[in-house]
Amino acid sequence: MSDKELVTQFFMEGYQNKNYGFVLQCLSENYIDHSPAGARSNQEAVNILIAVSKMFSDMQITIADIFSENGMVATRVRYKAIHTGECMGIAATGRSISFEALENFKVVNGKIVESWGYWPDKEIEALLK
């Protein structure tokens, strides 16, 4: 599996299909998450995905852009979901929301070893209000 295929499957299985066992297989033992949520372990990374799935149901993922060079994979991802659980202190609204996020990954020997993510929190908060 190429680095781009690995990252694409990570998104599809983790966010859309909730296949958390697959996500754990994608991550190296020493995985580091540099995003603001900053998972400190592989299980914590899965716990973040589980929390997101409780906030947003019917998650649909579209990889808008994906580039890979020298073990780095850069993505622009479109998310579409229904707000079904508390998020940022805002109770579930039942609204359908869409937003884009940027995620970068370092892949070594077929495993994700590091990631950097940016989700537009202010935009998401505005969509929920």
Model-predicted regions and their roles:
Residues 1-129:
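C-terminal and inter-domain tail/linker signature
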